[in-house]
């Protein structure tokens, strides 16, 4: 039978500490409910003594969570432990997590105590917490830089006092995997009463080792991993939940352990945390990055189309994503282009693959990424006849003050003919410009994504706007680049509308062929 590893999520405690702005109670509850659906065993949701706001959010979450243990942090201080209990007592099941520093550096410089005093404080804290609950976790902070004899001594004392989980954190991300695994193995072998508690690990990512250290610890006997969604946390972050969970799942042959996590929820929770915390996910982040399942090399794409297992060790569906993306770029091969056309329902007889692939490479060199509707336009519209953009932005001005709604004046050229209009209202100048453009074109368009990135430094920086719009159930992309954000936003919308016009033209050509 495989052993189970307890997943202790600390997104709302250690993760939240890293944010520039605190989350509201409502946002924290939203994340907590998502973590409950994800299937975490324990969620650490705050440090109640630190502020009234933290106390209230811990209490609110404790009241709503039914299928996970709710934990709160406290120093080895009576008032902290009492506050943690007061906030948690409404929960179905709760844990008090108390900690004290154990490394010589912390003990002498921060606590200004002897190690004997520290052991005494740890024992008193665990005993006090045990008065409130039989689920008490004890952490020796900065264990990674504490001598092994001292770790074993304080852990043994904490277990004797009633700790049911003992956490050996690498607080500053200092350890390397073999070294950390060795610490866990020694705790397991040298602490006489270790069978009465679960060994937990809490790793930071300062040297990029958090995932590796946590997995090595499990191989050496740890049975709880403390982690956060997307690896958010102080400095370089914490162990990433999605990475350790998927590593244990994909390499169960090697690890021999599993978790209670419903991996289908990973993508959804990852996106929610990223948005609510305003913490973008790096595109090449393992498991949840936007490129994690995207293949753009021609050789890889050809292999993927023949057999997914050639370059994919886990399927995107396991984390709740629909399908891997084969990005069409200048590096894509004919197989990927043909595959995209087949996905849209076209047989090889419907178009000339050689001609399409040549045109595709020209466009990809110019544009970077090519979308499905671009392929259709290349396949069915004769580019030699000069496929100019039907819509061009001619003139633009927008004005906005605090007192009055935003106004915009827009002049477009549609098929060479000038059209102009003014619009009032909207949530600012960009909105006013969009209203004006949509009024002029008469298209029904819904905005589903808007992203602004600065290209370059300082006042000379260009603002690039990337948008995704929906028209008749289909998504179209637009990009605009200008020194002025309103102008780059307008250019992005015009770009997307030109893609829509091309799609209309393709549809007309197809209808004409059928009649």
Curated annotation (Swiss-Prot):
Quaternary structure and partners: Homodimer.
Question: Would you tell me the Gene Ontology cellular component terms?
Answer: cytosol
Q: Where is this region: Regulatory domain?
A: 392-515
Q: What is the lineage of its organism?
A: Bacteria, Pseudomonadati, Pseudomonadota, Gammaproteobacteria, Pasteurellales
Protein keywords? Amino-acid biosynthesis, Branched-chain amino acid biosynthesis, Cytoplasm, Leucine biosynthesis, Manganese, Metal-binding, Transferase
* InterPro entries in UniProt: 2-IPM_HCS-like (IPR050073), 2-isopropylmalate_synth_dimer (IPR013709), AIPM/Hcit_synth_CS (IPR002034), Aldolase_TIM (IPR013785), LeuA/HCS_post-cat (IPR054691), LeuA_allosteric_dom_sf (IPR036230), LeuA_bact_synth (IPR005671), PYR_CT (IPR000891)
List the subcellular locations. Answer: Cytoplasm
Name the Gene Ontology molecular function terms of this record: 2-isopropylmalate synthase activity; acetyl-CoA C-acetyltransferase activity; manganese ion binding
| PANTHER family (UniProt xref) | 2-ISOPROPYLMALATE SYNTHASE 1, CHLOROPLASTIC-RELATED, HOMOCITRATE SYNTHASE-RELATED
Q: Residues in domain Pyruvate carboxyltransferase?
A: 5-267
* Protein name stated in the entry: 2-isopropylmalate synthase
| Top-level taxon | Bacteria
Q: Which CDD domains match?
A: DRE_TIM_IPMS
Is Repeat one of the keywords? no
Q: Which gene encodes it?
A: leuA
Q: Which cofactor does it need?
A: Mn(2+)
């Amino acid at each position: 039978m495989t052993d189970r590893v307890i997943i202790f999520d600390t997104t709302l405690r250690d993760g939240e500490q890293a944010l520039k702005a605190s989350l509201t109670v409502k946002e924290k509850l939203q994340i907590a409910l998502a973590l409950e659906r994800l299937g975490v065993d324990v969620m650490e949701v705050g440090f109640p003594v630190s502020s009234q706001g933290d106390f209230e959010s811990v209490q609110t979450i404790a009241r709503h969570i039914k299928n996970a243990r709710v934990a709160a942090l406290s120093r080895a201080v009576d008032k902290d432990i009492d506050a943690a209990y007061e906030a948690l007592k409404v929960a179905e099941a709760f844990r008090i997590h108390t900690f004290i520093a154990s490394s010589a550096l912390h003990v002498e410089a921060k606590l200004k105590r002897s190690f004997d005093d520290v052991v005494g404080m740890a024992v008193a804290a665990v005993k006090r917490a045990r008065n409130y609950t039989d689920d008490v976790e004890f952490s020796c902070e900065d264990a990674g830089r504490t001598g092994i004899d001292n770790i074993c001594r304080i852990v043994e004392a904490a277990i004797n006092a009633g700790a049911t989980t003992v956490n050996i954190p690498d607080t500053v991300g200092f350890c390397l995997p073999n070294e950390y695994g060795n610490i866990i193995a020694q705790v397991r072998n040298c602490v006489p009463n270790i069978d009465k508690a679960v060994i937990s690990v809490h790793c930071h990512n300062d040297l990029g080792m958090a995932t590796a250290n946590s997995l090595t610890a499990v191989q050496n006997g740890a049975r709880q991993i403390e982690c956060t969604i997307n690896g958010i946390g102080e400095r370089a972050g914490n162990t990433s939940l999605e990475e350790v969970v998927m590593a244990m799942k994909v390499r169960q042959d090697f690890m021999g352990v599993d978790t209670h996590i419903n991996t289908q929820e990973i993508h959804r929770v990852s996106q929610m945390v990223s948005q609510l915390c305003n913490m973008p996910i790096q595109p090449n982040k393992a498991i949840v990055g936007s490129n994690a399942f995207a293949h753009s090399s021609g050789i890889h794409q050809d292999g993927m189309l023949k057999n997914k297992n050639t370059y994919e060790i886990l399927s995107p569906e396991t984390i709740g994503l629909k399908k891997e993306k084969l990005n069409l770029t200048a590096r894509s091969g004919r197989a990927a282009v043909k595959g995209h056309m087949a996905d849209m329902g076209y047989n090889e007889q419907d178009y000339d693959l050689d001609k399409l692939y040549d045109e595709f490479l020209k466009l990809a060199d110019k544009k970077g990424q090519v979308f499905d509707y671009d392929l259709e336009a290349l396949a069915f519209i004769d580019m030699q006849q000069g496929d100019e953009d039907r819509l061009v932005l001619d003139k633009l001005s927008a004005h906005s003050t605090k007192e009055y709604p935003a106004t915009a004046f827009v002049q477009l050229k549609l098929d060479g003919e000038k059209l102009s209009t003014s619009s009032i209202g909207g949530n600012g100048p960009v909105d006013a410009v969009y209203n004006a453009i949509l009024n002029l074109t008469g298209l029904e368009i819904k905005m589903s994504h808007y992203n602004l990135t600065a290209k370059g430094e300082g006042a000379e920086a260009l603002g690039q706007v990337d948008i995704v719009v929906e028209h008749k159930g289909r998504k179209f992309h637009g990009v605009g680049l200008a020194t002025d954000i309103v102008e780059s936003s307008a250019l992005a919308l015009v770009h997307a509308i030109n893609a829509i016009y091309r799609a209309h033209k393709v549809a007309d050509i197809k209808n004409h062929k059928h009649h």
